[in-house]
Amino acid sequence: MLKYKSDFQGYSCKFSPFLDNIIGCCFNQYYGIIGNGKLSIFSFTESEILLKKEYKTNEAIFDISFSEIYKNYIISCQGDGTIKLWDFSNNNNLPLFSIKQHEKEIWNINWSHLIPNLILSCGSDKLLKITDVQNGKVLNTFNHNDIIYSCNFHPTLSNVISSSSKDKSCKLFDIKSNKEIKSFNSNYEILTCDFNRYDNLIGLGYSNGIIQIYDLRKSDIEVITLNGHNLCVKKIIFSPFDSKTLISVSYDMNVNYWNISYSIPIHIFNHHKEFVYGCDFSLFNKNLISTTSWDNSLCLFNIN
């Protein structure tokens, strides 16, 4: 296992979709409650993680997403409701642009790989927004009844997005018709959601530690329930390589590796000593995973 130790707490980590040895991570001072943020770009080898570029911000950074067009572009979302675009190939420490798209904290941001000029963001203002990065214009706005924690573009349907919320629902929206398609309702807050790239499935992670997976073609009754966390599930991600593999991270400080055909995790990794906030699969190596935590660390490891 490779580990990088920061002086700030880890919030989100993402592998580059273009460069097989590049990963980004955002860290925050004082657990993101007050203080500054850092966007760190790393290169890595089989033996070490190397800091390549670092940007410091006055506000906490809660999530990041690499561009699906330009290999050296990455976008970040802030505690003050701003979105910043960075080019980590140059020596300039200023963003290419900074736009205020939300009135409160932005918790999640994603770049569409099907329509690569679009980004999706959500936040504490209860809003979900589609922004055109070419001009900064908001194209669509959707809402929940409470804080929106997580949002995603559908991997194959360019007009479909998802969002999960403190209001105990996960909603699907059509950005062409500007209408809600479906709502999955729960008795618990839904902190995270992710689409499966190969099957018509969506996974939801709940505040009670449960993960449920739904078939988008069928009813609102879950088809799979995964039990393996003792506290809130902070993030789930399906593997980009197959339909059965999932990783999840939690406030219980564990990283769980699942085959969704089984109700319990195949492996439980407990290398973190604080809440685990971020995780990702490499797009170039099906066994390579990254995690980041409030224990100030970014970790890379091979699941084999």
Question: Where do the model's predicted regions map?
Answer:
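Beta-propeller domains
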Residues: 1-4, 21-53, 88-91
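WD40/WD-repeat beta-propeller blade N-cap
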Residues: 4-10, 55-61, 99-106, 142-148, ...
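Conserved strand-to-loop turn within each blade of WD40 beta-propeller repeats
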Residues: 26-29, 35, 77-80, 121-125, ...
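WD40-repeat beta-propellers
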Residues: 34-43, 83-87, 109, 128-132, ...
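Blade-loop segments of beta-propeller domains
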Residues: 48-74, 104
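A structural motif specific to WD40 beta-propellers
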Residues: 50-52, 94-97, 137-140, 179-182, ...
